[in-house]
């Protein structure tokens, strides 16, 4: 049998071996397959090429003079939504799971790449190709640790599947788009989630033990629009910890270096993005990037309550103050942090302005990280849209 592609002669890296991106590796899984053949072009942390891949995925790159596209990328539509009948046990209301199930049930795809957890550890990601609704539901709830989603790409090619849905985050999707034409698929659908600040499993443990009152019972957590981290516990209770009460001086080294050098918070290359940060509290935020994304969303439209996105407040002063506070590792007493959280929740940015606040805060932090730790990569690694966003603020040296 003759190989169609040179990657089929390549060999995956062995577990725990040094990765081509070195300390910036996000463990996306590409190097765990023979697609490592393309790693120099595909890896988001070796070759940043969001604008080129936007053209490939959406037939155009973002308009940098359009304020919404500058921040949120190419899109046809942007709405807030929630399921009329939420899926039990879902992190939000279950929109991502519902779309995946409908695509499978309608025969649009033969499999769904998603992430379950290992039987031994609910926070240990286990990528799978789901072929039934039950297998999709077993993957509900975000996994806050680095996850090798693309490690199953060899299985996809060898299975003979021709129509596939991949659910993933920005760094995974950049690598996926870079090798998309080598997968032998007739149709690839990409459902993305926004993503920042993932951790290793050990880093997650440190974060939980430093921040939660009961780290051993945390089921999942999220940094929410009310400026608090919401920890959901096994008994169903929600623990809320204000952002401003985080022990920043102890947590600076927790987040993965890849996440500290990432500028694709909003998953620019997915067909459809489902998150929460641009929506009012209790709603999810949906970005339809292209016609394929619209096709996916249309499958569940009758299951959703929707409303237009909104924007309120001004983020810029809070972002500027936060740059210095984070850089100095300032930690407030919890009683002060709680008061600040209440006040900022009342008068602070909401909706799309909260999303811009979060993007600005992370991009300025990440720009400084790259500048200080990988200055030789700064010019090429930071996309033009991120440079414009960061350029609004005064940064420390």
UniProtKB/Swiss-Prot annotation:
Pfam families found in the cross-reference section: FrhB_FdhB_C, FrhB_FdhB_N
Single GO MF annotation: oxidoreductase activity, acting on CH or CH2 groups, with an iron-sulfur protein as acceptor
InterPro entries reported for this sequence: Co_F420_Hydgase/DH_bsu_N, FRHB/FDHB/HCAR-like, FrhB_FdhB_C
PANTHER family: 7-HYDROXYMETHYL CHLOROPHYLL A REDUCTASE, CHLOROPLASTIC
Protein name: Uncharacterized protein all1601
Organism: Nostoc sp. (strain PCC 7120 / SAG 25.82 / UTEX 2576)
Lineage: Bacteria, Bacillati, Cyanobacteriota, Cyanophyceae, Nostocales
């Amino acid at each position: 049998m003759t190989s169609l592609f040179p990657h089929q002669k390549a060999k995956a890296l062995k577990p725990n071996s040094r990765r081509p991106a070195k300390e910036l590796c996000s463990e996306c899984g590409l190097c765990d397959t023979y697609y490592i053949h393309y790693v120099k072009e595909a890896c988001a942390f070796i070759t940043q090429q969001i604008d080129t891949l936007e053209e490939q995925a959406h037939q155009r790159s973002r308009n940098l003079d359009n304020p919404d596209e500058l921040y949120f990328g190419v899109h046809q539509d942007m709405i807030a939504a929630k399921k009329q009948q939420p899926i039990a046990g879902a992190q939000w209301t279950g929109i991502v799971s519902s779309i995946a199930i409908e695509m499978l049930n309608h025969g649009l795809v033969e499999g769904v790449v998603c992430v379950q957890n290992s039987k031994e550890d609910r926070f240990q990601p286990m990528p799978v190709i789901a072929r039934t609704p039950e297998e999709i539901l077993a993957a509900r709830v975000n996994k806050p640790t680095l996850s090798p989603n693309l490690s199953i790409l060899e299985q996809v090619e060898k299975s003979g599947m021709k129509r596939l849905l991949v659910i993933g985050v920005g760094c995974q999707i950049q690598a996926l788009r870079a090798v998309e034409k080598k997968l032998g698929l007739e149709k690839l659908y990409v459902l993305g989630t926004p993503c920042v600040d993932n951790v290793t499993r050990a880093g997650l443990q440190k974060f939980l033990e430093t921040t939660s009152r009961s780290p051993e019972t945390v089921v999942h957590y999220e940094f929410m629009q009310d400026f608090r981290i919401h920890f959901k516990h096994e008994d169903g209770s929600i623990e809320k910890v204000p952002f401003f009460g985080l022990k920043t001086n102890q947590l600076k080294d927790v987040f993965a270096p890849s996440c500290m050098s990432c500028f694709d918070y909003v998953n620019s290359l997915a067909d459809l993005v489902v998150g929460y940060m641009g929506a009012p509290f209790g709603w999810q935020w949906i970005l339809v990037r292209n016609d394929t994304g619209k096709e996916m969303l249309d499958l569940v439209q009758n299951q959703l309550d929707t409303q237009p996105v909104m924007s309120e407040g001004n983020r810029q002063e809070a972002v500027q103050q936060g740059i210095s506070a984070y850089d100095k590792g300032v930690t407030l007493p919890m009683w002060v942090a709680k008061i600040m959280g209440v006040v900022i929740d009342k008068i602070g940015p909401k909706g799309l302005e909260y999303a811009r606040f979060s993007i600005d805060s992370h991009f300025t932090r990440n720009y400084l990280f790259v500048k200080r730790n990988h200055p030789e990569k700064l010019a090429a690694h930071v996309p033009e849209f991120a440079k414009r966003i960061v350029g609004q603020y005064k940064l420390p040296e």
